[in-house]
Amino acid sequence: MITEEILKVLLEDCEKAYFEKEIPVSAIIVDKDNNIVSHCFNKRQQNNRVIDHAEILSILEASNKIGDWRLNGYSMIVTLCPCKMCTEVIKESRLDNVYYILESKYYNSLSTSDFTKIEVPKEYEEKLNKLLTLFFDNMR
């Protein structure tokens, strides 16, 4: 399910978010053949909109590409377990599956039973964790 290409795009998007002073979270939506349909990172600061989380932006981009808000037959891979707001948008979009890499240490997310935690090569998990840690450490 999770290819090297997907992991690289997720990491690259997290790095872009970090350097743009955004929380380094990214999301990808893939079709049933694992083709990337959309990918985004958080842009709350950049766009000055509280709702511009990676998950929501990826859903909007995918919906625009396929011409339908219903994302049946598509799956999302996100670097951090989605927050409550994103969880509700994900449910409304009708994605078939949502996979996440990291648990959230920084805020309470909904029950993770709605989503599937996936194991990725340790190097990716460590890099993603490091970006989040650096981001939040630099905020203080």
Feature names for model-found ranges:
Residues M1-E20, P82-R140:
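Zinc-dependent deaminase
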Residues V25-N34:
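Short beta-strand scaffold segments in enzyme catalytic cores
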Residues Q46-I56:
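A short, polar/charged loop-to-alpha-helix boundary motif
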Residues S38-R44:
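Short beta->alpha transition motifs characteristic of CBS
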Residues D68-L80:
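Immediate flanking context of iron-sulfur cluster ligation sites
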Residues S38, E55-N64:
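Glycine/small-residue-rich phosphate/adenosyl-binding loop
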Residues I23, R70-N72, R94:
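Short loop/turn motifs at secondary-structure junctions
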